Structure formats: C-alpha cells, structure tokens
Amino acid sequence: MTQLASSYDPKSFETDLYEAWEKAGHFKPSGTGEPYTILLPPPNVTGTLHMGHAFQQTLMDALVRYHRMRGYDTLWQVGTDHAGIATEMVVSRNLALEGKGETRDSLGREGFIGKVWEWKQQSGDIIERQMRRLGTSADWSRSTFTMDPQPSAAVNEAFVRWYEQGLIYRGQRLVNWDPVLKTAISDLEVESAEEDGFLWSIAYTLDDGLSYEHVERDADGVETLRETRDYLVVATTRPETLLGDTAVMVHPEDARYAHLIGKSVVLPLTGRRVPVIADDYVDRAFGTGVVKVTPAHDFNDYEVGVRHSLPMINLFTPVAALNENAPERFQGLDRYAARKAVLAELEDLGILVETKAHKLQVPRGDRTGQVIEPYLTDQWFVKMDDLAKRGLELVEDGSISFVPPNWINTYRHWMNNIQDWCISRQLWWGHRIPAWFDEATGSCYVGRSEEEVRAKHSLGSDVVLNQESDVLETWFSSQLWPFSTLGWPNEQAMAERGFDRYLPSSVLITGFDIIFFWVARMIMATDNLVGKIPFKDVYFTGLIRDGQGQKMSKSKGNVLDPLDIIDGISIDDLVAKRTGGLMQPKMVEKIEKATRKEFPDGIAAHGADALRFTIAALATHGRDIKFDMNRAEGYKNFCNKLWNASRFTLMNTEGAAFTGMPTPRTDAERWILSRLAAVSSEAQGHYANYRFDLLAQCLYEFAWNEFCDWFLELSKPALNGADAADAESTRHTLLYVLEALLRLLHPLTPFITEQLWQQLAPRLGLAETTLSLRPYPTAAEFEGDFAQAEADVEWLKAVISAVRRVRSELNVAPSKQVPLRLQAGLEQDRVRIERFSASLSFLLKLDSIQWLAEGESAPPAAAAIVGELKLLVPLEGLVDLDAERVRLDKEIARVEVEKEKSETKLAKFTDKVPPAVVEQERVRLVDWNTQLAGLREQRAKL
C-alpha cells in the first residue's frame, strides 16, 4: 500500500478509483437482497452535463451507494434520449457550419438520418464520460438509447396496443405549429408571455341591406351616441386571419343583435357571406360584443366551429405563408407581410374603424422562440381522460408518493384538466409511426411491421403501402422508460433484465418542471400497459440558479459546467466557453466583463467530492436552489480537513493491527462512540426522508467539529500519556471511528473516502477490497453505556472552549503556560476537574489548576463561566495591561468608523439598488456590531 500523500489532490486519484470500481463490477446488480432501483431521467444525446444533471445525479448516486452498502440489490438504470426536435436542430446547425452546402432537405430523409446516426456515434458518449467523472455508480453495461432496437420495439408495441384499445386515433385537429421546425409541438413546449401589440376594429357589412340601431353610453349610463348602422364592428389582434373567418358571433341574450342572429355579413376583402351565430362564449361587455370566428386558426374558435358545424378554412402553409385558400393577391405572403397588406386594403376601403395599443399573450416555441401558429392538420392523438383518471388515483391513494407532497396539487390540477395528447411530429429523426396507408384507397392500417399489416388484412403484393412519414414525439418513448429498459415486451429479454424484480423502481428523482411531460405519462403508461406502478416515490428537486438567484442559461452567460468545478478552468477558457456560439453577439462584452469580475483567476479545481457534498448541502425541498461557489470552496476545505485528520490517525497508528470494536478506556473514546451512534441513526433518517441537506449538515458537524476538532484533540493526552493501555485503546478507537466516518460519508464523497479507507483497512483487519461494499453504519454497531461519559465530555469541551476564548481575547501566545483558578461550582464540577486535570493541563497549556478557598478574593483575572463554575485566568504576567488598553481603544475607534459608514450607506440606498447588494451591506453592519461588542467586552475586562 502506497503511503498517503501529504496533501489532498483529488485529480491524482479520482479517475483511477472510478476505473477500478467499474473494472471490478461493483456497480452491477448483485442479484441478492431486496431490490433497489433508480431510473436516470435520460439526458438528451445532444447534450453535455450541466448543473441540473449534476445535481440530480449526485442525489441518485448517493441513494444507490447508500442502499448498496446496506445490502440491497441495486440497479441504477441509465441511458440517453434521442431528443427528436433538439437533435434535428443541432445536426442541421452543424451541417450549416460545415459549409458543404448540405441541408436537411437536400440530403433527404434517409441521408439526413444517416448524418444524425454519425453524429450520435461521435458525441453520444460524451455525457456518459462526464457522468463517470462525477462518480456515477451505474451499471453501464445496461445503458440504453431510446432508439435502440429493444426500446424501439416497445414503442411500436405500445402504439399498436393503444390503437387497438381505441386510445390512439388520427384526426384533423388544431395543434400548436412551429413554422420554423415545421412540426406540431405540445402545449408544454409553448411559452406564453405578455407582449405589446394592437387591437384593430374592422367593419363587416351586413348582407341584404340589413341594419340596426347602435347605441353607446358612458360609464354612468348616459347615452352618448345613437345611430343606424348597416355593419358590425369586430375587433381582432390578427387581422390577416379574417380571410379565414367562417362566422361572426354574438351572445344569445344580447338584445342589440337578437334580430341579426341567423343573418349574414359580407367578409371584407373576399366578398364571402358568413353567418351571424349566437354562442355563450361571447363576452357582451368586451368591445362591441361581436366576435369574428376563425376555426382553423384559434383554439377557442375551433371549439365554437365544432359546436356550430362551421367550415374550417386553413389559410397557411407549414411555414406560415398564405396558401391557395386566401385571395390570389395575398397568396405566398408571410403572415406578417399579409397582415400589413390586409390592413392597407382595409384602410383604403375605409372600413378600418380603429387601431389601438393592446397587451396580449403571445405563444412562442420554447426551442425556436417563434410565434406558434394554431394550425389545422392531420395528427395522431392519445385519448387521455381514462388514463388520467387512473393516473390520478395511483397518486391520491398513496400507491405513489410525491416528495415534497405539495406537488400533488399541481399534478391533480393538470390531470383534471387534461387534453388529448398530440403524439405525431413532422420530423425525420425519431420512432416512425407504425401505420401504413394504401396508396390507392387511402385506407390506414396499424401494425408492428408492414409484414404483420399485410398478413392481418390479407393485403397482397399488388397493394402499395406507404408508411406514415411522421414520427412520435420524444415523450412517447420516454414514458415507456421504466419498463422498456427491462426488456418489455420481449419475454426473454424481460427475464434476462429482471422485469419482475426491478419494476417498480424505488424512487424517481427529477425536476418539477417535467411533472407533466414525463412523470404523469410514465404513471399512466406503466399502469395501462404492464399493470404496475413505475416507481414508489418521486422526489422533485428544485431548479438550480446562480448565486444571485438567476436562471442559468447560455444567453445570460452564467452557466457553470460541473466539470469545470471538478477539474478547474482558466479565466480565458471560461470566457471563451461562455461567449462562444452566442445567439446574441452583442452580449459577448457584457458576459466577458461579468465573468472576469466573478472569477478573476478562473475556477480552481475542487474535485468531484467537494462538488457532490455542496450539492447535497444545497438540496432543500424548495423550488429554487442558489448555487454558491463559496460553499464549494468550503466543502473543498472540508475534504482537506478530512484528509489531514486521516494523516494524523495514520501517523499515530503505524504498525497497528486491530480487529472488531474497541473496548474504550477513556471518556473521550466513550463520548465519540456515543456521538457516532447518534449520527449514524440521524443519517439513516435523513436518507429515508430525502433530506440530503440535513444529511450533509449532520455529517459535516460530526466530521469537522466532533471528530476532527474535538476527538483528535482529546485523544492527544492519552496518546502522549504514560498509560500504555489508554494509548493503545485510543489508537484503536481513532482508526475504528474514522473508518465508520468514511462509511458514513462514502455515498456523498466516494472518492476521498475510498482513497483514505484503503490506507486504514489493513490496520483494522477488514476483509473487503472496497469501501463501497462495506456496511453502512447503524447505531447498533456502537451501542454502549456511554451516557455519563457523553455528559462529562460535553462539560469538558465547554471548559476548554471557555478558557481558550479567554486566552484568545487576551492575545496570549498559544504556547505560553498559564495558571487556572477555579471558584464556586458544584460537587460534580470538582469531581470532573479531578478526573480531567491531565487533559485540561495538556490541552490548555496550564501550569497549574487551583481552587480558591471559600471567601478567598480572586486575583485580577479574565473570567468565564460554565454552569455554576467560574474559571479565572490571572492577568499578572500575561499581558501589558496599558499597551493592551491602548490597542483595544484604537481598534474600537476603527470599527466604530466602519460601522457608521455602513449605516450611512444603508440609509442612502434607494429602491433601485439590487436586493442582493442591500442584503450584503446589512450583513456587513451586523458583522461590525458583533466585532464592536466583542472589543468593548474585552476592554471592560481590563
């Protein structure tokens, strides 16, 4: 065994350790013990590891490692998603960058798909390499790609079964259409935001010389206008769509227009007659109370059109240009050019009544940012009502638990208001819909293959069949992930991959932002297709934001690559990474300036363990999680402290050969074993409740404060004392507790704990070859009658802390011997002083410990109190009192000036000052006040 390095350098061992673990097969399911399964939300094959991935994967890996150490048969199912739209966009962009003139359309379907597979082979394993660097302990031999043959067969099977159940149907419906991608997208892929626009009012002439009496009143009901009109005024935010109007509508109880219901108006610019219909949908109080109806280009109008059996006129091509259904002079115009042309003609005709500014909700595609067009087209849909009813039952009856439970309300609302799911996409990359059309008759046949279709429907070779060109949206295959990865529907593959053993999985860890995209659909699909729940628990994580609470995004230039935190990156490389390939080049200078200010020296290497521990510590149950680099630096220091504590232990146990649990001889040993039992119990509780933040906190407190700061200190008197038995027992306990601590920390910080454990294991006679297969500590391992020792040592710690604080306040040199005088106190204090006198003298550098007699006056001294016991450190000979008074007076004056500056700053802050800046100054003021109070207290003692 090589000697432990003198300094903590994670780069020197992390990669080697991972390779050794993987080579030894430690990540594969054992096949014995209770199964514990986690599904990795499959990252897009287009992607690289980002902080969201690192966050969730760290928590998943901690759970997998924890349960593996507890003897569970662990399976972490990993893989990647083909990501239809995202991948087509990336490959199309790469083709353009290559400059060979090749495009998606010029290559054709087969040629383009070939290019996608080439690109997938080149870049598809990048994210898996990055996951390994983070420490992901997954069985990579089972890694699955959603376009692999097995999951592709599952997709076809699911489609056919749902079609045969009547759940899948094909129909002409209004969908969200992205004119850049030229495909339908789901409601969940549409982002609506308020934007500035206009509301145009247009006159529609009544047919057959009809007229009505138009009356206007002010807010008080006073009549301001009365006239006879032969036209209706209709307001719209999209005047170009009037070319596709098939009705105007009024409220059935609106007396103003009652006699016009069933009559007609002449559609401007077209001369077409369209009916005046009545529908409760109309808001009589808005505008004139007359609404145009364009069923093919508005979702609400579509429902009206269905209710009234109105014609549906599709005005647009797939790229949102006007088609042959528009008057010839408008055909071929882009929708916005058409808007200008329509408005110009309306104005020339004198029927553009009014134009006014208007705020409106504009829907845009989340990938392209383009305005989405409601578009009438043939698509494939899944009927969701019955699936959703059952999916909601499984959560509400407790079959599946949500953590935190408040997400049930969000889930319930969506499931109760669910719409049929449009599953077809007009793309090439993806699972092609298993449906074939008879070229001659147009008849549609669904089956697992063309051969099956021909056999089932007795179609000879003379019948020409063409497969549906559309592919299924990515989430259709993703919803099958819990069981397609376990071999379904192939019975042999299901047996080989442990379908019955590993389904349902134990927990799904995912972001709340895909509760509808993925979580709900997995619940519904798994229940319907295999009669099981997909998972027992769902733990929803918050979204990772930067230190200021901003969403991390490429456009903001605030993205942190987890590998840069692990391995470090220079400032120039970081700037290049953040500014390269920006969609808005004007942001480059701003992003570079902000980056150089935040990271003037780049990002130092922190190692995987420090990042993982940071993530665990930040994993609260809130919606948003601010990633703070200072926390990462702090946990790197934590790893360094653990390293140095291990070096101390190893140096003091050279040649040791212990077995089993030590028989503690000192109170310090009994105390640390008692604390070890408590923290082991607490840690298991936090794992059970998915409280990774509290887990990290309790382990940090035990490792840093109780083991490193206190037990190592309290062990020194025994290690350096005359009692050989005490020294030997303490050495055994040092090794034993450190080994248990490494086991406690291992799921969160696997690399450093394994590296240190390899040094300790031989000295404890342990048979295992790796820490990852050691049992996770339980309180029962360390049980003993330690209550009195724990109370005694807590008292000892309080005394040591109090005297050290006095020494520090008096600026007494650490090496200087001082006397300690004791006054008052209880009988128990006297017993404890006697018991711990050697430890106190050793640790506090005391040259004497004396009790003052009852009634004896105390010498001039700095005092501290622990319970009823007064601790006195005589001042004579320790400090130059006059010089110390002068020093403290100067320091008090300096801090008072800084305090006043801070108060003045806060008083002058306005509402325009960022809240983070205000909070930072408030923290400074608190710090100045704390310093000032401490200095004044010291001055009073002199």
Swiss-Prot record:
> Which residues fall in a coiled-coil region?
876-942
E.C. no: 6.1.1.9
Reactions catalysed, as given in the entry: tRNA(Val) + L-valine + ATP = L-valyl-tRNA(Val) + AMP + diphosphate
One matching Pfam family is: tRNA-synt_1
Instruction: Write down the InterPro entries for this protein, in alphabetical order.
Output: aa-tRNA-synth_I_CS (IPR001412), aa-tRNA-synth_Ia (IPR002300), Anticodon_Ia_Val (IPR033705), M/V/L/I-tRNA-synth_anticd-bd (IPR013155), Rossmann-like_a/b/a_fold (IPR014729), tRNA-bd_arm (IPR010978), tRNAsynth_Ia_anticodon-bd (IPR009080), Val-tRNA_synth_C_sf (IPR037118)
Please indicate the residue ranges that the annotation assigns to the motif 'KMSKS' region.
551-555
- UniProt keyword terms in alphabetical order: Aminoacyl-tRNA synthetase, ATP-binding, Coiled coil, Cytoplasm, Ligase, Nucleotide-binding, Protein biosynthesis
Motif ('HIGH' region) spans which residues?
A: 43-53
* Gene Ontology molecular function: any one: aminoacyl-tRNA deacylase activity
Can you name a GO cellular component term?
A: cytosol
Is Signal given among the entry's keywords? no
Gene Ontology BP annotations: valyl-tRNA aminoacylation
Residues annotated as binding ATP are K554
Instruction: Answer whether the UniProt record assigns the keyword Ligase to this protein.
Output: yes
As for subcellular location, the record says:
Cytoplasm
Provide the transmembrane region boundaries: none
Instruction: Let me see what the UniProt entry remarks about domains.
Output: ValRS has two distinct active sites: one for aminoacylation and one for editing. The misactivated threonine is translocated from the active site to the editing site.
What assembly does the database describe for this protein?
A: Monomer.
Task: Explain the purpose of this protein.
Answer: Catalyzes the attachment of valine to tRNA(Val). As ValRS can inadvertently accommodate and process structurally similar amino acids such as threonine, to avoid such errors, it has a 'posttransfer' editing activity that hydrolyzes mischarged Thr-tRNA(Val) in a tRNA-dependent manner.
Give the record's family classification: Belongs to the class-I aminoacyl-tRNA synthetase family. ValS type 1 subfamily.
Query: What protein name is recorded for this chain?
Result: Valine--tRNA ligase
Question: What is the originating organism of this protein?
Answer: Stenotrophomonas maltophilia (strain R551-3)
Record gene name = valS
